[in-house]
From Swiss-Prot:
Has an important function as a repair enzyme for proteins that have been inactivated by oxidation. Catalyzes the reversible oxidation-reduction of methionine sulfoxide in proteins to methionine. One of its GO terms (biological process) is protein modification process. The active site is at C11. It comes from the Bacteria. Keywords: Oxidoreductase, Plasmid. It comes from Rhizobium meliloti (strain 1021). This is Peptide methionine sulfoxide reductase MsrA 3. The gene is msrA3.
Length: 168
């Protein structure tokens, strides 16, 4: 059985490129979520964030592990911004599908806060998942097709998120 995760953390190209490579991630697609416009598109996505939908095998990878990479590859302390990308489209958000994901998201954020790995306070939103509008084909797997394309996401070397008991 598979599970679904929906995240937003800046431009969806870089998020998808790194998350899709995790063992246990079966499928990813980029799109628009967390906002107010039905049938969102790149040119008209209102208050939606650029997001990624992840289908994963929980026997091979945990939701927590996906969130650990999420917090490693984007800056969760900058509101409505990732690198040079500025605006609500680029906010940090976790859209949970059930109470278990909500709990894990809140615990992981608390671990990030306690770890000191990021210099500021985490501003990642935690909200229930709503509609996910798939982005246009040219945005899907963008960096797989254009390996030298734009991204502001990268794994930080030696970045390991401890649980609070180990971080304190």
């Amino acid at each position: 059985m598979t599970k679904r995760a929906v995240l937003a953390g800046g431009c969806f190209w870089g998020m998808q490129d790194l998350i899709r490579k995790l063992p246990g991630v079966i499928e990813t697609r980029v799109g628009y979520t967390g906002g107010d416009v039905p049938n969102a598109t790149y040119r008209n996505h209102g208050t939606h964030a650029e997001g990624i939908e992840i289908i994963f095998d929980p026997e091979r990878i945990s939701y927590r592990r996906i969130l650990e990479l999420f917090f490693q590859i984007h800056d969760p302390t900058t509101k409505d911004r990732q690198g040079n990308d500025i605006g609500t489209s680029y906010r940090s958000a976790i859209y949970y599908v059930d109470d278990e994901q909500k709990r894990i998201a809140q615990e992981t954020i608390a671990d990030v806060e306690a770890s000191g790995l990021w210099p500021g306070k985490v501003v990642t939103e935690v909200e229930p998942v709503r509609d996910f509008w798939e982005a246009e084909p040219e945005h899907q797997n963008y960096l797989e097709r254009y390996p030298n394309g734009y991204t502001c996401h990268f794994p930080r070397p030696n970045w390991v998120l401890p649980r609070r008991s180990a971080a304190e």
